[in-house]
Amino acid sequence: MLAIGLLASVHVVAQAPSPARPTEVPPLPADAHVGQTIELGGRTLNYTATVGTIPVYGADDKRSGDVVFTAYTMDGADRPVTFALNGGPGASSVYLNLGAIGPKHVKFGDQGDSPSDPPTLADNPGTWLDFTDLVFIDPIGTGYSRSVESAEQTKKDFYSTDNDIHYLSRVIYDWLAKNHRLRSRKYLVGESYGGYRVPRLTHYLQAQLGVAMNGVVAVSPYLNPTINENSDFSPMPWVTTLPSMAAANLERQHKLSAETMAPVIAYARGDYAADLLRGRSDPQALTRLVDRVTELTGLDKAFVRRAGGRLEIGAFLREAHREQGALGSVYDSNVTSFDPFPFASSQQSNDPLLESIIAPTTTAMVDFVTRVVGWDVSARYHALSYEVNGQWDTDSAALRQGAVPDLREAVAADPKLRVLIVHGWNDLSCPFMGSVLTVDQMPVMGDPARVSVREYPGGHMFYSRPESQAALRKDVLALYGQH
């Protein structure tokens, strides 16, 4: 989960500097395996869970780090393999693993879930394991993956946009070669900043390492980092976020559907954008904006007028639930918590959802890795690393360019490659409208459905809702069935 820069926008308690790295870093354990079963759709699936490492080497062929993976595999000659990454940067793959598509899951991320709930793993009805093997990758600095270099060299080699793509591509290549799976059908799935990674990984693997992906699933992706810039001039920041705010209001009224969202989307990309561009040249534009935005969001009209019909995300998340003394989450504005500082002029606490998911995912994953699989490690597990996020090179030209050029080139080069982009309606961290507008500006290369966008009830982690998770599984099955 997460998109770059979001962690910097919330209140974070200062952390002590990391201790100096020892001269010799003790080795991680050898790969460990355990046989497991789940019940899925009336069938029993037997599979092997593996926790292991892939070494990373620098330009001098010296080992620079160790990437830890969790793999779930079943017997079968023709099974595809799917590589999964989360985002941040600084997030491990635990959210896709134990929240979305792995064979076991722990409940988190929905309204009413508590960090102190017992993190019990149960069979996951939304898993993809029955139709693909799964390999979850934790980038350096997340999970148990670690650098063996100095802090300065680690930042240079691992916490920059291009180098991140280069070493992760090699990790995927090395896993395929080590496990004799280069001839398998291959897929990538990435969430949030992981959704930025997977188009770029696809193109780099295809063009530089000679490994072609069959399909890509981008979950709540961060495709186009500059789309929301320059809000004083461009209408795009407001056009991309208004539909998700309206979706949250429709959901609170139990009216959210693709049908009710259609006129919202049409307004956002039509009259709303036009009136924003008109500005003071049309004295009636502001009145039209305020009336329609008030109707769509259900907010107080005076509040909308003060904002000029341009609703800043943080202000919206407080205003939407102010009467209840609650805050909405940027990841799903209808997931709330009490506002601990209700009289402050701006939000003073961390995001409600972000705060609540670290404990259950960390506890469940550490117990699974060490006790269930038997990968006996004493290191700390980082489900979410603020340190990695804070050290990331956010000023690089490659990051500002976004993932869309790589997406276009990868799709153009392989006429059989298919890409599914999926979002939750309520997500304000990576709004669905950004992907809709981005894809609509891409040229049609063969079948228009080769690159498609789907939306589901929920937010950034919409898969925490059983109905949305089931709908995602159905759409992904259809994608895999094309190959």
Q: What role is predicted for each listed range?
A:
Residues 16-21, 61-159, 440:
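N-terminal cap/lid subdomain of alpha/beta-hydrolase-fold enzymes
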Residues 104-107, 206-298:
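A catalytic-pocket lid/entrance helix-loop region that shapes and gates access to the active site
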Residues 166-184:
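Conserved acidic catalytic loop of the alpha/beta-hydrolase fold
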Residues 181-193:
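Alpha/beta-hydrolase fold nucleophile elbow
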Residues 190-203:
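Glycine-rich nucleophile elbow surrounding the catalytic serine of serine-hydrolase chemistry
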Residues 283-429:
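Alpha/beta-hydrolase fold catalytic core
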Residues 417, 431-441:
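Short alpha-helix in the alpha/beta-hydrolase fold that links the catalytic acid
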Residues 459-468:
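Catalytic histidine-centered segment of alpha/beta-hydrolase-like enzymes
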